[in-house]
């Protein structure tokens, strides 16, 4: 599931934001403020505060701003690159990552993409 979900996020980033980098990092975001927001979120996650980072992301993405969609997709891409031991120690799971991506896609009215991630969960 790890590889396929990362590939799916990479495909969505290419379709929506014309990002074709081999590895998706904060550097693919052109806007420096948005890049810093993503870095802050991934730093929280890297320190085991995934729930806190995800809550901040949720608040940001309620406004429908496409830049925040890009941040969200990259956040979950980063998170999905973590090993299972790290996720477990942070009280998080791959299923929660997939549900987060699905929820993000639904908030941006990307129902086809949300359905693809829903299928990936099952």
What are these regions (language model features)?
Residues 73-122:
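Amphipathic alpha-helical binding modules
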Residues 16-37, 59-87:
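Short, charge-rich amphipathic alpha-helical segments embedded
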Residues 39-43, 47, 78:
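Residue-level signature for tetratricopeptide repeat
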Residues 9-13, 38-42, 58:
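Amphipathic alpha-helical repeat scaffolds
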Residues 30-34, 45-51:
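Helix-boundary capping/turn motifs
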Residues 5, 12, 50, 56-57, ...:
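Inward-facing hydrophobic residues that define packing positions of alpha-helical scaffold repeats
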Residues 12-19, 51, 63-65, 83, ...:
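Alpha-helical junction/boundary sensor with strong preference for TPR arrays
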């Amino acid at each position: 599931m790890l590889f396929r979900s990362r590939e799916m996020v990479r495909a969505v980033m290419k379709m929506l934001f014309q990002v074709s980098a081999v590895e998706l990092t904060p550097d693919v975001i052109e806007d420096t403020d948005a890049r810093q927001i993503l870095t802050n979120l991934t730093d929280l996650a890297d320190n085991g505060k995934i729930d806190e980072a995800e809550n901040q992301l949720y608040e940001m993405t309620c406004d429908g701003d496409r830049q925040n969609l890009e941040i969200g997709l990259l956040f979950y891409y980063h998170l999905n690159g973590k090993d299972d031991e790290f996720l477990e120690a942070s009280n998080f799971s791959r299923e929660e990552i997939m549900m987060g991506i699905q929820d993000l896609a639904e908030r941006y009215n990307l129902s086809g993409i949300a359905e693809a991630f829903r299928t990936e969960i099952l």
